[in-house]
Amino acid sequence: RQMCIRDRKYDYDTTFFRFADYRTGEENAMQGAASGRTVSITHSDHYKTSFRYDPQARTYKMQMYSRISGKFENTVDELNAKQLSFDNLLVCFAPIERYPGDSGDVQQVSYISGGDAYCFSRGGVQHGRWEKASPEHPLRVYDKTGAEMLFNRGKTYLAIVDDDEWSNFSYQ
């Protein structure tokens, strides 16, 4: 299977990330990983998310900051009234700028620059780097040794965060 973009051909016989193979029971147990049971991400002054790991469900429960209440509130799916949860969180830092001359809040992300990446799963965190060869290529995430990170199967929350917000990012 191939996909044509701008008269270029790229093989897309893989998933967006390198997911654990369900056929073999493969899993990233996050052995030796630092604790990543709570995660706080500031995207901007008005957009903040937090996640808390639920060891029973093996997922991260999502909350968003409400300027009205002044506190974090559960992020709930309108269709089923359940709190959103994710098996993996991927936080990627990148240079983000406003489009020149744009009067709204449209952002331009430098996707091909790469940057720091934090992968959270099973209550742990792996620090590494993300890269994209071009806007048309898939995003790749590598650990400190240069090996491509293995993501556990399930829903993955991907956050692209401005480098300027790095000091407001925390986990424990």
For the regions a protein language model found, what residue spans apply to each?
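A surface/extracellular/periplasmic glyco- and lipid-processing/surface-interacting theme
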Residues: Q2, R6-Q172
